[in-house]
A protein has these predicted regions:
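Intrinsically disordered, low-complexity activation-like regions
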Residues: 1-57, 61-72, 77-178
Length: 178
């Protein structure tokens, strides 16, 4: 089953869709994989963790699919902690070295999505070692926001958090959100 996720993500769709806001794509994910997201969110895909590929697929479902399925709602971030733990375990095991650079970039995304400065220091090391300029650049941009605010201000409204005046000013700047 996890092969379906990886085939879809890395073979079937174009990379431009990975981070694009597209309602049709979000609906497609919901139709094809909504039930898998539900199982992953409930912790029911533990069997996938027997291989690094299965773990990567579960991370993609929890981290990336959540953002598409529940765009603009608190649920879009609801599985970030679980995805981060799975990614940390895969890295600790050393098995992630078997993945392609592109796949490892997605395994590392829960680090980039974290609002922890400590986790971002680890993310910076991971993306530096990965040696993919675009992904490293994105991590540097994410880390700068966490270093400055301790959180992602663009999530404040979604999560019901009050923005500080400095965050409000930042949010008015072009490119302040992801």
């Amino acid at each position: 089953m996890h092969d379906r996720i990886l085939d879809f993500w890395f073979e079937e769709i174009e990379p431009v869709m990975w981070f694009k806001k597209d309602e049709d794509f979000d609906r497609l994910l919901h139709t094809r994989f909504g039930h898998i997201w539900q199982a992953a969110a409930a912790g029911e895909l533990a069997g996938w963790r027997a291989t690094v590929e299965g773990r990567l697929a579960e991370v993609i479902v929890l981290d990336q699919f959540s953002r598409n399925l529940f765009r603009g709602t608190p649920r879009s971030f609801s599985c970030d902690g679980m995805a981060l733990i799975l990614a940390q375990e895969a890295i600790r095991s050393g098995e992630c070295e078997r993945l392609s650079r592109e796949q490892r970039g997605f395994l590392y995304l829960p680090f980039m999505h974290s609002e922890s400065a400590l986790i971002h220091r680890q993310a910076l090391q991971l993306y530096t070692e990965l040696n993919n300029g675009d992904q490293l650049d994105f991590e540097l941009r994410h880390k700068a926001i966490i270093d400055r605010f301790g959180r992602y201000p663009h999530r404040n409204a979604i999560l019901g958090r009050v923005s500080t005046p400095e965050e409000e000013e930042f949010l008015r700047q072009p490119g302040s959100g992801f």
